[in-house]
């Protein structure tokens, strides 16, 4: 049985409420999201700490695209023992990463199901609670063979493709240092109107010709 719902940020209920409820009720989770700000992470910290205590494991894939996800966020997420963190580094300046998908696996004595949320919300304070956002939630029960349905399987397959991509980098201290150095270069070059592109192995500076 499938059930689809539209999630918006309203006066009574918000995307934040749905996210917290699904995190609290899942047996595992997978999140692919372009931007995670520290303000967005802050409102989720207590829930993430509770999941760590309960040994509920998850995978989070975010990105360096647009430099919206800060080194501080990556460092804090890396401290959770139950979270496997990867960072997608687009291969060229013309490639972006703007996906927002939240997957929750839920099991009970009676059933097994996936809840998938796909839409416009990043993990930022405003996106979680106040922005005009549209997100579609779909609950999909697993069949007799305990396999996900067609829709959920397609989302899981796409997540796995991105997760295993050569552009999805494991978090490490070396990665964090490289990213911080890059952001410092961006700040120094902003006044010169230069365009910088972050890569895990090189820093390329492209300054417009006069």
For each predicted feature, which ranges?
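PLD/PLD-like phosphodiesterase catalytic module centered on the HKD motif
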Residues: 1-210
């Amino acid at each position: 049985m499938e059930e689809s719902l539209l999630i918006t940020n309203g006066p009574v209920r918000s995307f934040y409420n749905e996210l917290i409820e699904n995190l609290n009720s899942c047996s595992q989770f997978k999140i692919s999201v372009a931007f995670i700000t520290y303000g967005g992470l802050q409102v989720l910290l207590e829930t993430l700490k509770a999941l760590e205590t309960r040994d509920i494991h998850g995978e989070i894939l975010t990105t360096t695209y647009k430099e919206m996800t800060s080194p501080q966020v990556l460092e804090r997420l890396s401290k959770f023992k139950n979270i496997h963190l990867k960072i997608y580094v687009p291969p060229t300046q013309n490639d972006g990463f703007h996906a927002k998908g939240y997957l929750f696996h839920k099991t009970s004595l009676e059933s097994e199901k996936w809840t998938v949320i796909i839409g416009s919300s990043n993990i930022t304070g405003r996106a979680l609670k106040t922005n005009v956002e549209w997100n579609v939630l779909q609950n999909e029960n697993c069949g007799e063979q305990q396999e996900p349905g067609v829709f959920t399987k397609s989302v899981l397959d796409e997540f796995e493709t991105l997760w295993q991509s050569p552009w999805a980098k494991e978090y490490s201290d070396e990665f964090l240092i490289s990213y911080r150095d890059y952001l410092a270069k961006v700040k120094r070059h902003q006044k010169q109107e230069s365009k910088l592109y972050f890569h895990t192995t090189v820093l390329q500076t492209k300054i417009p010709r006069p």
